[in-house]
Amino acid sequence: MHSFGYRANALLTFAVTILAFICAIASFSDNFSNQNPSAQIQILNINWFQKQPHGNDEVSLTLNITADLQSLFTWNTKQVFAFVAAEYETSKNALNQVSLWDAIIPEKEHAKFWIQISNKYRFIDQGHNLRGKDFNLTLHWHVMPKTGKMFADKIVMSGYRLPNAYR
């Protein structure tokens, strides 16, 4: 006969093995979900565009963000982190990213939204590189599952340009 300790160890090992197997299947099942998020971002107004006293350019924008991220949610999704970034190139850096807005979306019911806001975070370039600059607005998202690996993706919207003169 085996002692109580041996039996408890066998039962615990079996339970952990089954739990690991269920987690692996849950993570694997996310690969079969049909994800087709959509988004549109409009710049409604440039509130101000100025040069700060220490020489950096700063922009304040009013954005209209429309997104449908409901297809990112499966039974294994805990939450989705979404953010909008302005992306542009300068002579010193091939890619500059400035986060303008972000949100944590906890449920599928909140994943379809329309908001009109001024940028939540300051759009500042370290230098004076923003006058007349073309830039993209990109909606990034990170899907955080209950079990398994996180994944991220984005939608890039191009064709935006800042004015040539400060306002």
Swiss-Prot record:
One of its GO terms (cellular component) is signal peptidase complex. InterPro entries: SPC3. It holds the Pfam family SPC22. Residues 33-167 are lumenal. It is found in: Endoplasmic reticulum membrane. The chain crosses the membrane at residues 12-32. GO terms for biological process: signal peptide processing. The keyword Membrane applies. Residues 1-11 are cytoplasmic. It is a single-pass type II membrane protein. Keywords: Endoplasmic reticulum, Glycoprotein, Membrane, Signal-anchor, Transmembrane, Transmembrane helix. Glycans are attached at N64, N136. Essential component of the signal peptidase complex (SPC) which catalyzes the cleavage of N-terminal signal sequences from nascent proteins as they are translocated into the lumen of the endoplasmic reticulum. Essential for the SPC catalytic activity, possibly by stabilizing and positioning the active center of the complex close to the lumenal surface. Component of the signal peptidase complex (SPC) composed of a catalytic subunit SEC11 and three accessory subunits SPCS1, SPCS2 and SPCS3. The complex induces a local thinning of the ER membrane which is used to measure the length of the signal peptide (SP) h-region of protein substrates. This ensures the selectivity of the complex towards h-regions shorter than 18-20 amino acids. Belongs to the SPCS3 family. This is Signal peptidase complex subunit 3B. It comes from Arabidopsis thaliana (Mouse-ear cress).
